[in-house]
Amino acid sequence: MVVKTVRVLNRAGVHARPAALIVQAASRFDSKIMLVRDTIRVNAKSIMGVMAMAAGCGSELELVVEGPDEVAALSAIERLFQNKFEEE
């Protein structure tokens, strides 16, 4: 299992488009991928779950990945956050 804290850097937060990018990236991997914000824990492969987090700009999320391709999965999703979901 690998765990990393990521921060939402884009101004609009995790709305529909960034949520779709997260789900699309997560779905390419066999690992179980969870996003955690405060007491909310969601499957990163679920568009409704990711959007329900309502993570605004500046929010910190814990990315928890467990499985055979966990390092690659963590890296791919972390890159989305670092690149502000290519919105800015």
From Swiss-Prot:
CC terms in the record's Gene Ontology section: cytoplasm
PROSITE patterns attached to this UniProt entry: PTS_HPR_DOM, PTS_HPR_HIS, PTS_HPR_SER
Subcellular location: Cytoplasm
Activity regulation field: Phosphorylation on Ser-46 inhibits the phosphoryl transfer from enzyme I to HPr.
Keywords: Cytoplasm, Phosphoprotein, Phosphotransferase system, Sugar transport, Transport
InterPro entries in the cross-refs: HPr, HPr-like, HPr-like_sf, PTS_HPr_His_P_site, PTS_HPr_Ser_P_site
Aminoacyl-tRNA synthetase in keyword set: no
Active site: H15
All copies of domain HPr, residue ranges: 1-88
Residues with PTM Phosphoserine: S46
Pfam families per UniProt: PTS-HPr (PF00381)
Broad class of where this protein is predominantly found: cytoplasm
Biological processes, Gene Ontology terms: phosphoenolpyruvate-dependent sugar phosphotransferase system
PANTHER family recorded: PHOSPHOCARRIER PROTEIN HPR, PHOSPHOCARRIER PROTEIN NPR
Sequence similarity: Belongs to the HPr family.
Function field: General (non sugar-specific) component of the phosphoenolpyruvate-dependent sugar phosphotransferase system (sugar PTS). This major carbohydrate active-transport system catalyzes the phosphorylation of incoming sugar substrates concomitantly with their translocation across the cell membrane. The phosphoryl group from phosphoenolpyruvate (PEP) is transferred to the phosphoryl carrier protein HPr by enzyme I. Phospho-HPr then transfers it to the PTS EIIA domain.
Name by which UniProt lists this protein: Phosphocarrier protein HPr
Organism: Treponema pallidum (strain Nichols)
